[in-house]
Amino acid sequence: MTQDSIIITPPAASHREQPTSTLVRIMRGICAVLPLDSINSNPWDVWEAVARARTYAVDASHKHSSIFVGQSCLRLLGIRGWSQNPPVTIYRDNRICTSSLPSCHVGSTTVPATSVSCSEFPPLSEERNRIEGLVVEHPYDALVRCALHDEPLESFVLGCMALNIWSQFSMFHQDECRRRAEEIRTELIARLERAGHVRGYRRAHAILKTIDPGCANPAEAALLWLVRSICPFTVKTQVHIGVRGHHYYIDILIEDLHLIIEFDGVAKLGESRIELEQAKREWVLRDQNLRDAGWQVIRVSWPDYDDWEQLRIRLSRVLGPINPAPDCRFLWKLPTQRCDGPLRRFYSRTPRMGRKHSDR
C-alpha cells in the first residue's frame, strides 16, 4: 500500500477567513485539505471546494505540468458556469484521453464522480498565465474555447459571469462597466476570428455577441440565455425603474413589450424567517408597483429549471408568435445530462421520470 500524497487546496476568496479544514480523498493516491467545516458547510460550498481540489489533484498527479483550459481555467479565476460539478479539462501535447475522478464524501455531502478530459484542441494563442501555481491558457482563450466546444447553456452562463467579473460590473456605474465589457467582447470576437471558421463558429459568435455583464449569478444568466434564444426585441439587464419613490433594478427588461422577467433566488429573500417574511412583503409591493406602472412581470424560480422545454414554451407564450433574431437561433440547444444532469448540479426536487434532456 502506498501512502497518499496530501495537497493543500488554496481557499476560494469567500473562504479566506475559514479556520476549519477537512481532509478528503480526491483520487487514488491523493488527498486534499479542504478549507471548510465538514459538519456545518452548505452542500454547494462543499461541491465548490471539491471542484477546486480536483484541479490541484490532477496537476499533482502528473509528472509534467498540464495546461488547464476552458472551464477549468475560468473556475480557477472564480468564474462559475452552470455546472456545479464540472469535469477537469487540460491540454497536453499529443494526448487525447478521458479518465474518471471518483465521488468525494465530505460529512453528509457526497460530490458525484466526474472526469478529467484531455482536450484535442490546443490553446488559441501562446499566452499563458499562472494561477496559484497552475498553468492556464489566457482567460479570453478559455472563454472562446468554451463558446466553441461546450454546450450553449454552459458557455453562455460562463460568458456572462466572466464579463460581470472582468468589467467589474456595478449597477450603479453601468456606463463605465458596460464600456469595459464591450472592449472585452471585441477582443473575444477577434480571438474567435483568428481561430477561423471552425466547427461551432456560428454558435460561438452568437454566444459572444449576446452575453451580458449585468447577470449577477448563473441562474440569471441561464434565464437570459433562454430569453435571447426566442426574443427578437432588444433585451436589457439591470435597468433602473422608479415607481412611487421606490427604486428597482430589473433583471431582464423588454421595453418593446413592456415586459419584465426576473429570477427569484434564495439569496434575494434572506436567511432568517424574519428576513424571509420581510422580503416576501417587499416583493409583493414591488410587483404591485411595477404592474400599476404598466409593466407585465414574469417570475422564474429554481424549480422552473427542472424542465427547460416547458419553461421555454411558457416564455414563448408570453412573448407571442415571433421568431428570434437570425443569430440568436443558434443559442438554443436542449441541455444534455453531461451539462445539466443530477451529477452536475443541484435540483429543487428529485428529477421526474421522463424529464427531458438531449441525448447528445
Residue ranges and their predicted role:
Residues 1-197, 320-360:
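Short gly/ser-rich loop at a beta-strand->alpha-helix junction or flexible surface loop bordering the NTP-binding
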Residues 1-13, 17, 178-360:
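Surface segments flanking catalytic/ligand-binding clefts of nucleic-acid enzymes
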